[in-house]
Amino acid sequence: VDGFKLDRGEALVPLKSNCKAHDGRTCREMINAYPVEYIKATYEIARDMHGKDFALMARAGYTGSSRYGVFWGGDIRSYPEGLRSAIIALQRSAVMGYPFWGSDIGGYWNGELDREVCSRWLAFGCFCPIMEVGPTEDRGLWSMDTKPAYDPQLLATWRLYATLHNRLKDYTYQYAEEAHNSGMPIVRPLFLEYPGQKKAYDDWQTYMYGPDILVSAIWQKGKTSHTCYLPKGDRWVNAWNPNNIYKGGQTVTIETPSYKIPVFIRQDSDVKLGDLNQLYQESQKKKKKEPD
């Protein structure tokens, strides 16, 4: 066993009883401490077994728990509003000291999996430190509730963003080290990277992934175009069309079919994602029929 996914932890302390913990603290005193002790105990066991070569992914946390593992957002609904809440939670978690965070792509419960929502969530999940697909109740992106249950187009989108997320691993690791050493998170709301610009506080769907990649996540259904703010002081390369370079300090609108998330690269950076349109075309060529 190389790691654990630690579910629950935040609702296991009965507040209405007179119970006490082993050290004498009441359950009410333990309500926030319990999630920290939960992941800490698991961390210490795993460390004794594996040294530093293991991983813990927890759902519950409180001040101090981020030193022991990475986190995901728990049971999010499979609705557009669920994706919206994940976009907000990613950035809030980052500035609260949880730099390694992800969400259940597609949501976890309550309602049919929607193809467009799943496609948007895959795109967003690519630009999170943790990318995982999380539907339950025998549902998955390879077994949809509605016909066709096996959707080659959706799986091609998954392939596109899984490939891109893997390409980003060295970049992510670089700023994971920075987060560990300095506290500066991997994911940075625009106002954190560009504090002097008012529009950086207003555009909450747009954030920085590290200092050089700007992402503007989409949660609404039916959006065929999207407008986002590009901070002034830099020039920005459209990752979907590297020939399009924009001066910062303006809002831009680009076409956004369901598979496409606005991504811009700071021009003077060393980031090399390639042409995302070409990567998308390659993912389409690999579409397959449902296996026997």
Regions found by a protein language model. Give the residues of each.
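Catalytic-domain carbohydrate-binding cleft regions of carbohydrate-active enzymes
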Residues: V1-D292
